[in-house]
Every structure is written in structure tokens, then in C-alpha cells.
Amino acid sequence: EVKFALRQLQVKRVYKVYNDCPAIACNTYLKGNVSILGKSEELNNADRKNIEFLEDMQINQTASTLDKLNFKGQHWNVDCIEFFDATDWNNNLVVERNFLSYRKNHYRGNLLQVRENISKNGFFFLKEAPCSNVQLAYQGYDFMAEFGSFTVTGLGVSEKDITPDKWTPAYGCVIGVYGPEAVDKLVALRTYQKQIRRLLPQRDEMIMMNTWGDRSQDSK
């Protein structure tokens, strides 16, 4: 557990480490008076100019940050996975986007998997929050990537949610690492998921399907 203060805002971060698990979870709690939470809206691509000078590469947008990693190198392959609920309205419940990290851009999703293209080793960010389109105090994106810098954004709380008399939880964040094989990133994520809840094989080791259909409404 780590505590620190930013002016009148108190921050508590609780880290969870599990045996034989390549991931560390972090839960963040806030208390106090605050007017410094980062606010940011995604820059419209039409407002961006051609890069002709060094200054043109600087994008000074701020955002509320859950976690951030900075690495050397410019060869990072990224998968960003976004989930959807509300199956009455959404038929495609998983969307995966693959990209090479370049200039600063924003991405939506709960899971960011990053692989270094030379060593082939990688890491993941898991944002423990609802689907992007139903998150609280949502700023339009969940991750930022710029070359070897990767950030998890969006606390799930606004200034009015934070009070001096109690700890207010923000969304959780998990950092995990994995090896060069394609299956390694799946094993690393699943290993963490098996730590946070009791696994009952007869209940959990199965695939279920929604068979409601129209719930026989047409036959009435």
C-alpha cells in the first residue's frame, strides 16, 4: 500500500502480488478536495497539421492517468481489445485493433497488449472497468500510445465524486508481462484472472450461449 498527496488530494494505491503470476494489480483510491483531475478530449484528426518542424510533434493534452510505462525503442506492435455489452443492441461484442505505436494517439478498450518487435517479449495493460461505452466520467478513450510510451487513462470518477471524508475507488489497472510465443500473452492474462476468483471447473470451464431468441414473443 502506497499513500501520497497532490496538494489537497490524497491518493492511496493498493498493489496486489500473487505467487507464480506474471501480473501486478493496482487499485487506486482518492480522498480530499480536488480540482486537478486531468481533462482531455480527443483531438480531431482534421485539426492536426503536417509535421514539418520538431515543435509540430508536441501534443500537450492532459488526461487523468491510472498507470504509465515508458520504454526505449520505436518498434512496438500493439493489440487493443474493446468489449461491448447490451446484446439487444450489439451483435459484435469484441473488436480488436492492431497498430504500430507511432505519434501520440488515443485508443478505446479494456485490454492493451504490447509486443516489442525485436525481442518479441511483451506486456499488457488490463483496465478493470466496464465496457468503454458505459464507463463513468468517460473521456472518450482508455489508452494513449506514443512510440515506447503507453498510458492507461480514465479514473471513472469526477471531481464531484471525491470528498474529504472517505476514500473513493477509481477503476483498477493490471500490468502483466509475457514471453515471445503467441500463446504466452493469453496464458499470462488467464493466470492473473485465475488468482482473483475461485475457480470451479464444473462451473467455469465451459462455454455458454444466449439461447433466449425472442423469448417466444412471436408465438403469443
Question: Model features per residue range: what roles?
Answer:
Residues 1-220:
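Carbohydrate-recognition beta-sandwich/jelly-roll modules
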